[in-house]
């Protein structure tokens, strides 16, 4: 039986509601630059794989509003130490983005964006488990070719492809299959470098082995001009190669 795939695309949106924009301390020009740095631009297009799966969860607003891939509790979120918990107060350059929201605003933001996203995510996984008895999440991201100041890993040796894993939810066969598929296409591949881990709904995390997950991060230099955000000449090829890799996962 083919493996049912769910695409999780959390950081592709550029949308910032006016009520949130009004809280930001940076100019329009600075905001445009920050969106260019922090958005996983075009991942919703690169990972649009209609011949392989029609199951996808795409976060509708920018991560600068609320980041769905952070722990809700800042005490559990390592990035909160640099002002990038679930609600960012710092920019990628370690300057002020906004003041810390009060309890009321924080609750409103989480209820408006974070909680609905995770409900949809959990429900989508539950549906696949019910229908197919298993679910494979691909956590879809991209990364800058040079480390941004906020990043914990400042190493310059960045691969074409970064694969993020979880000891419980990423079986060896899955990691090996994805890694070998990208290598055969001519890409350099690193595991959990420069970014580590992969997402699973908390209802299943470390509990349900039928839920598998792997993060695929694409180096932006492969498909876009990082200084402008425009698509690069190899955009179509990278998109096709992602589809090739995903099709092999389905058949594994």
Go through the PLM ranges and name each one.
Residues 1-137, 142-252:
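N-terminal catalytic or cofactor-binding beta/alpha core of small enzyme domains
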């Amino acid at each position: 039986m083919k493996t049912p795939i769910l695409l999780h695309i959390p950081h592709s949106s550029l949308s910032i509601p006016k009520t949130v924009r009004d809280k930001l301390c940076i100019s329009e020009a600075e905001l445009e630059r920050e969106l260019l740095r922090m958005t996983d631009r075009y991942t919703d297009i690169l990972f649009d794989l209609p011949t392989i799966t029609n199951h996808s969860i795409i976060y509708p607003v920018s991560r600068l509003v609320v980041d769905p891939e952070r722990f809700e509790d800042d005490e559990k979120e390592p990035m909160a130490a640099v002002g990038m918990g679930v609600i960012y107060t710092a920019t990628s350059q370690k300057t002020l983005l906004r003041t810390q929201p009060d309890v009321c605003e924080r609750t409103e933001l989480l209820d408006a964006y974070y909680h609905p996203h995770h409900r949809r995510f959990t429900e989508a996984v539950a549906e696949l488990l019910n229908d197919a008895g298993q679910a494979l999440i691909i956590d879809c991201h991209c990364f800058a070719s040079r480390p941004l100041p906020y990043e914990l890993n400042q190493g310059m040796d960045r691969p074409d492809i970064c694969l993020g894993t979880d000891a419980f939810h990423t079986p060896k066969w899955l990691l090996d299959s994805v890694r070998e598929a990208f290598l055969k296409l001519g890409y350099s591949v690193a595991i959990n470098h420069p970014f580590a881990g992969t997402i699973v709904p908390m209802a299943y995390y470390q509990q349900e082995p039928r839920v598998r997950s792997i993060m695929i991060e694409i180096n932006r230099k492969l498909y876009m001009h990082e200084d402008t955000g425009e698509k690069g000449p190899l955009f179509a090829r990278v998109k096709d190669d992602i589809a090739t890799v995903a099709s092999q996962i389905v058949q594994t």
